Swiss-Prot record:
Record-given protein name: Large ribosomal subunit protein uL6
Annotated GO biological process: cytoplasmic translation
Function (record text): This protein binds to the 23S rRNA, and is important in its secondary structure. It is located near the subunit interface in the base of the L7/L12 stalk, and near the tRNA binding site of the peptidyltransferase center.
GO cellular component: cytosolic large ribosomal subunit
NCBIfam families from the UniProt entry: L6_bact
Keyword Heme (UniProt): no
SUPFAM superfamilies linked: Ribosomal protein L6
Gene that encodes it: rplF
Annotated InterPro entries: Ribosomal_uL6-like, Ribosomal_uL6-like_a/b-dom_sf, Ribosomal_uL6_a/b-dom, Ribosomal_uL6_bac-type, Ribosomal_uL6_CS
Phylogenetic placement of the source organism: Bacteria, Pseudomonadati, Pseudomonadota, Betaproteobacteria, Burkholderiales
Record carries keyword RNA-binding: yes
Organism: Albidiferax ferrireducens (strain ATCC BAA-621 / DSM 15236 / T118)
Length: 177
């Protein structure tokens, strides 16, 4: 059995988890999230915890039990604490400005780039060169951060561009004459 799939998911107070036919819903202070249940995994709830068992002895069911467990755990953490990703802008004149549900980027193009935020995602700019993306859905927060980074990825010679705050850019040496 999967090592991660063996561990139960603790459900804290203030979080409601409903396991219906083929859907798991988690509701809390941070919102509500839904996940389609996989047929290879049996989900059972007991005394403030959720446990996941493979439906059969196949490798796929074993692997999927760990995957389902972690996805539901991310949902529980998301509706209680939430997730955030930080991005930094490196470059002369590069700046970001949050305007409600929009992000306005000036990153070296001849025009400003506007990015709309999906529902459930908030964006903040504590400084003009820093972007903080927050939300309850871990996958969506990471996806939005990756889309913003793709607007101007860091280039390898000077390191200019949009990067994750914990990302290390290896700077290449220029060609010697």
């Amino acid at each position: 059995m999967s090592r991660i799939g063996k561990m139960p998911v603790a459900v804290p107070a203030g979080v409601d988890v409903l396991v219906k036919d083929d859907q798991i819903s988690v509701k809390g202070a941070g919102g509500s999230l839904f996940l389609t249940q996989n047929a290879l995994v049996k989900v059972s709830s007991d005394a403030g915890a959720l446990s996941f068992q493979p439906a059969n002895d196949s490798r796929e069911a074993n692997a999927m039990s760990g995957t389902m467990r972690q996805l539901v755990n991310n949902m529980v953490v998301g509706v209680t604490k939430g997730f955030e990703k930080k991005l930094n802008l490196v470059g002369v004149g590069y700046k970001a400005q949050a305007q409600g549900a929009k992000l306005n980027l000036t990153v070296g193009y001849s025009h400003p780039v506007n990015k709309d935020m999906p529902a459930g995602i908030t964006v903040a700019t504590p400084t003009p060169t820093e972007i903080v993306i927050k939300g309850a859905d871990r996958q969506r927060v990471g996806q939005v951060a990756a889309e913003i980074r793709a607007i101007r990825p860091p280039e390898p010679y000077k390191g200019k561009g949009i990067r994750y705050s914990d990302e290390k850019i290896t700077i290449k040496e220029t060609k010697k004459k």
